[in-house]
Amino acid sequence: LDSAGIFVNEKQAVPERSFPQPLRDVTRSPFKEKTMKLPASKLKELKEKFRGDVLLPGDDAYEGARQIWNAMIDKHPALIVRCTTTSDVVLAVNFARNNGLLLAIRGGGHNIAGNAVCDDGIVIDLSRMKSASVDPAARRVMIEGGATLADLDAATQAHALATPLGINSTTGVAGLTLGGGFGWLSRQYGMTIDNLESAEVVTAAGDVVNANATEHADLFWALRGGSGNFGVVTRFEFRLHPVGPDLLSGLIIYPISAAKSVLQQYREFMAKAPDELSVWAVLRKAPPLPFLPAAVHGTGMIGLALLYTGNPTLGEQLIDPLRKFDTPMGMHVGVQPYTAWQQAFDLLLAPGARNYWKSHNFSTLEDGLFDAVIEYIEKLPSPQCEIFFGAIGGATTRPAPDAAAYSHRDALFVMNVHGRWVDPADDARCIGWARDFFKASAPFASGGVYVNFLSADESDRIQNAYGQNYDRLAKVKREYDPDNLFRMNQNILPA
């Protein structure tokens, strides 16, 4: 069974980039960044010292380098520096600070708000810094800040080890981690940040520091959920766990007519599920999955996506109730490589489409929420739009809310309203649908929000994202970045 081929027939036309007015940036700074052309002498000096590439508008690689995952983002930086070493990052940070330039940091370029790129300023592109070193005996991995989830999984699964990551393998490790990070392994092993042992950071002053539980402990605390507010992380060290390499995983697809009953049974099932079992629910139009009859392609569906890390035979027994919530339209469940399951949804989330998200956390799932979900699923504005519930809980709830910057330890489910479409003419309709359902579901939410799911127009929710830890984060920001150099993020103002 090969999940990497689940969506092999999914044909999602992505045209040449075409941009309307972009969503408003929510960047704030105590000084106005310069937008004039930089003197040639300063650029020459930077290029002479820089080991990687320095790209300017008009260079052959510039257009491709400024584009990121979300095609709604259309920004034109004054220069893009593709770093190859930590020394390159130091040079770039100092150059931005000394010249008053707006600074954006690009890891995987997957941020929904488009913070990986900026207008007029400088983009520090880490995508060439992705080397990994695994110590299987110590169960540790060191990986550079430009790596993707696929890079990290490939390195660790060679030793049948893994750390909790997200579910789209093209996502950058850095952005995922700095916002908290959760995925299929999180119920058993916690958030990504709960497995972070140390980080090498280039600060706003251009210093290189190692942050861990004993060195720069305040910075280490802030990095674990405080987004990109405190510096450029050039290397991460993660704790690893025995995982796979082959695990039970797959999809069970039901018709949308059964959605409320399936969601109710899903809620009760997850309340008793062991930490080793992760099940997410997604509602959308059925893509042309090879295991679904052609007659149901494009019709409404609710899917249960699952992974079990234990013995597959026991896992089959545990998931048997999931197969009986109603009459499935199709199933694709079996033992397969963990890395294949990590990449199973990549084609549905390929770069080049237009994306807009709205998200809530939930400590419980109420029937009233299910009614709202069904109402808005019947109004899907495009075949790619969807609503999903990521079940976390388990190990993610056990640390104290102030153990790290990420504070939402009461969240058992993260819901994302994913507007996704191709034609710019559909912008208003798709964004409006996401916003309207977000409002309809708000009465049932627990109040927090996962910072990595905030769109560019949600500056009013930043304090909700950081929760009770905001004031402490602002103090750490004052210590490490008093002038708010790192502000292309869900920004925390220095106290």
Predicted regions and their residues:
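Short linear/disordered segments characteristic of secreted peptide precursors
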Residues: 13-15
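Soluble FAD-dependent oxygen oxidases
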Residues: 6-11, 21-495
